[in-house]
Amino acid sequence: MHEKDSVLIIDDDPMHLRIYGWIVEAAGYRALAAQVELDKVVLPEETVDLVLLDYNLSGALSAVKTAELVRSRYAQAPILVLSDAYSMPDDIAPYVRGFVRKGDPAKLVERLREMLGSRS
């Protein structure tokens, strides 16, 4: 039996962390969560295969700053950004490998499978 690919979900809303966790797990991946609180986020020590990052973070820690922190900790893990926008926001584009509009779980799973492969 192989180990499932892990997806780290970063959001400031605990409800969104749970919802996206369910979607990720239903797709066959292991979900990890990191909640952004005002000006900090505690990233897990373990290796992750992909990072799912909410663009619309409240507080002092922006999605761009969070993406920079993610890059320094998980250099090889691609970042997939979630946003209410219709296209990827320009300021975060250099840090991420993909974009999914919020509210489309099927598209999210499709992008996860494209980026991680359907091995899980």
Regions found by a protein language model. Name each.
Residues P14-L32:
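Two-component/phosphorelay signaling modules centered on CheY-like receiver
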